[in-house]
Structure formats: C-alpha cells, structure tokens
C-alpha cells in the first residue's frame, strides 16, 4: 500500500465505558502521552487479527491490570484529530475482578456520575459518546 493510502486509513481504536452502579470510569492521560491532561475512557488500538472486543479486553488488561467483560457497542464515530482520523468504537464493559487503582497510560482514575462528565476536559475522540451516556 502506498504511504499516502496508509496515512488516509482511520486509526481503529476501542474504549470501555466501565460502569460501577451509576458511575463510569474516566481516566486522565498522563504526562508525555498524546492529549496529556485530557480525559478519556480507557482502551487503545485494535491490532491486526483482533476483533474490537478482543482488543478492548487486551488493552484494559495492559493499562489497568484488570479483566473486563465487553458488552454492547454504545457508539462508534470517526473524529479528525490533527491530520489523523480516529475511528473510535465505545463499548459498555463490566469489571470481572478487582477495581483498578492505577494505569500505565493515565495519571488519574475517577468514577464519575453521567451528569458530571461535562465538567472534565475530554479528548476530542471521546466527546461523542458523552451524549449517549446522558451528559448535557
């Protein structure tokens, strides 16, 4: 594939909206990361040969050190960030083990009520799913 074609392909990314009662887990990007200081739902890139669900389970295990059960697709959007298109699929997810206390990619984890999600400075690609979750 020519380099120009590869650059035009959207980056396939998945994210988990992990619920604990009415609250959801928000994660702040750590220093030195793309979008440092901004909030996102945890997840990451889909690797070749993975389904989105497999990628999400792997990414959460790697970043948060906990297993999850992936549920329904909540939202899928493509957002232009800089010169790159991000194809983000957000899934409902449930913890199947311990509650995460730290992350390899984030400097802060916070459980947030849906009505309070808008108070956080979200990464651009994560903003569309906020409507689905009832943020204003």
Regions found by a protein language model. Give the residues of each.
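NUDIX/MutT-family hydrolases
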Residues: 92, 101-133
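Active-site-adjacent beta-strand/loop module that shapes the phosphate/pyrophosphate-binding cleft
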Residues: 67, 77-100, 110-114
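Conserved Nudix-box catalytic region and its N-terminal flanking loop in Nudix hydrolases
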Residues: 23-62, 66
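A structural signal for short, well-ordered beta-strand segments
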Residues: 16, 73, 90-91
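Residue-level signal for inorganic ion chemistry
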Residues: 16, 41, 109, 113
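Structural detector for helix-capping/boundary residues
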Residues: 44, 58-59, 71, 112-115, ...
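Conserved N-terminal beta-strand and adjoining loop/helix that marks the start
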Residues: 2-25, 45, 76
């Amino acid at each position: 594939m020519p380099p120009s074609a590869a650059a035009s392909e959207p980056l396939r990314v998945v994210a988990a909206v992990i619920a604990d009662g009415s609250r959801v887990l928000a994660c702040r990007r750590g220093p030195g990361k793309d979008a440092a200081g901004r909030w996102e739902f945890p997840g990451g890139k889909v690797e070749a040969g993975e389904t989105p669900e497999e990628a999400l389970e792997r990414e959460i295990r790697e970043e948060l050190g906990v297993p999850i059960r992936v549920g329904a697709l909540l939202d899928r959007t493509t957002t232009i960030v800089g010169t790159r298109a991000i194809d983000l699929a957000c899934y409902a997810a449930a913890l199947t083990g311990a509650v995460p206390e730290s992350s390899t990619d984030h400097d802060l984890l916070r459980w947030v009520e849906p009505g309070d999600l808008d108070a956080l400075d979200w990464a651009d690609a994560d903003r569309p799913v906020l409507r689905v979750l009832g943020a204003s």
